[in-house]
């Protein structure tokens, strides 16, 4: 990685980082030693392979349609992705994710926005990341990714030489379980909202580093409604 003031120079793992040299990572000291739920914002198809630049073995939950492109399908499988059918309850993917986390070694990447989004706002998230963390009692790591919307815009099949910056936030505790080992829906939703706020801050900071600060349109503030499946 390119080293800059306040940005740690990290060893690159095999993956996108070997062919795309314009990314930097900040906050690697916040990566937990064991399992966690890794929760980045999502603005481009390259957000997923970009995570291979992190000096940890990560496992990924990815939208099944990403496997329709042979190259990305091969790449995502190689770096540890498993497909999720967006818009339906994919029990097999959930069981796989829980099994990885219960093993206690590898982080699971779960994009809590559910799909690629456009614009500067992080709107209400799905509860999946908080649910996985609660069921396995592992921390959630908020991650802000800046610059990927211009490095590979929606609809593009090409990578452009744009700056990308990743900021890894401090781990958040999972929603608690009660004495019977059950989850409170309110606790899960509260954790999800805190996660949204943390990702927004990190995303904003990452965009500033990339020289493209987020600009909010008046009236674009997120509401508290849970996104529809």
PLM feature segments, named:
Residues 1-3, 21-25, 148-150:
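Short gly/ser/thr-rich secondary-structure transition/capping motifs
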Residues 1-20:
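Single conserved hydrophobic/aromatic residue that forms the stacking wall/gate
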Residues 14-33, 201:
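Short, Lys/Arg-rich amphipathic segments at extreme N-termini
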Residues 14-22, 69-79, 158-163:
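Alpha-helical membrane-targeting segments
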Residues 19, 25, 38, 60-61, ...:
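Generic preference for hydrophobic
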Residues 22-24, 89-94:
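Glycine-rich, highly charged phosphate/nucleotide-binding loops
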Residues 30-89, 96:
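Catalytic core of membrane glycerolipid acyltransferases/transacylases, capturing the structured
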Residues 92-229:
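Non-catalytic C-terminal accessory region of glycerolipid acyltransferases
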């Amino acid at each position: 990685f390119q080293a800059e003031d306040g940005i740690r120079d990290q060893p690159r793992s095999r993956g996108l980082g070997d062919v795309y040299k314009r990314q930097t990572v900040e906050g690697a000291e916040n990566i937990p030693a064991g399992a966690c739920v890794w929760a980045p914002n999502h603005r481009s198809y390259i957000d997923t392979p970009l995570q291979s630049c992190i000096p940890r073995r990560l496992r990924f939950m990815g939208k099944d349609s990403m496997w329709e492109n042979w190259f990305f399908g091969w790449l995502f499988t190689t770096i540890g992705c498993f497909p999720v059918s967006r818009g339906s309850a994919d029990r097999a993917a959930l069981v796989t994710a829980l099994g990885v986390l219960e093993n206690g070694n590898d982080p699971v990447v779960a994009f809590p926005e559910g799909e690629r989004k456009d614009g500067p706002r992080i709107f209400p998230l799905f509860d999946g990341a908080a649910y996985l963390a609660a069921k396995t009692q592992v921390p959630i790591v908020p991650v802000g990714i800046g610059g990927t919307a211009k490095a590979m815009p929606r609809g593009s099949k090409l990578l452009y030489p744009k700056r990308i910056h990743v900021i890894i936030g401090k781990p958040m505790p999972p929603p608690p379980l009660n004495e019977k080992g059950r989850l409170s829906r309110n606790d899960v939703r509260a954790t999800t909202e805190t996660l949204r706020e943390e990702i927004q801050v990190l995303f904003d900071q990452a965009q500033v580093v990339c020289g493209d600060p987020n600009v909010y349109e008046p009236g674009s503030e997120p509401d508290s409604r849970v996104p529809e499946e």
